[in-house]
Amino acid sequence: LNNTIEDMQLLVDTLLAIARNTTNTLTAEPTMLSECLENLVQDLDSVSDNKGMRINFQKDLDEQRRKLYPSMTKMVFGNILRNALNYSQGTEIDVILQKNTVLIADNGVGIPLPNNSKVQELSGQQLQLEIKGHGIGLQLVQKLCKQLGWRVELFDRQYYLNTHQDVDLAMTTGLIVVVYLK
């Protein structure tokens, strides 16, 4: 019960921080981002199993602790992962932690990006119209990332893999969400 109360208080504080457009009421903690991501993947295991999907996690072997707001970080990546599980229609989601980026890639059908672009910052109004059911979640992710000093972009998987040949993923259809950390 105490953990539930603490979790609810953290959620309320995080939502207030979002509404106030400040992180002054939250405490940044030295954290291994890989631990947060691994916990999210574990939390979503039953959902992914029920959908016949697998979430793969690749950590950065040279990872250093970084100051993070745990609740906001969990909201950002939890939302992106849940969207991938709910809308990709694929069989796998890959989460790749690199030095200053996190890639979340699915092998689903993808979406038509506006104006035939292959990359789209998640702030565009037009993008929200293209992705039914995602709009509010992606707006929240974009706002959280902005408050954290991060940037988030959505890529066509094939385009991204053609332009980033250092990423070891199969050349399939799908989407890649990249969160650029500060």
Region roles according to the model:
Residues 92-101:
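Short beta-strand/loop element within the Bergerat-fold HATPase_c
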Residues 111-126:
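Short conserved segment of the HATPase_c
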Residues 149-168:
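Glycine-rich ATP-binding loops of the HATPase_c
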Residues 83-85:
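Short helix-loop "hinge" at the ATP-lid/N-box region of the Bergerat-fold HATPase_c
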Residues 49, 54-64:
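Conserved catalytic submotifs in the C-terminal HATPase_c
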Residues 130-140:
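Glycine-rich phosphate-binding loop
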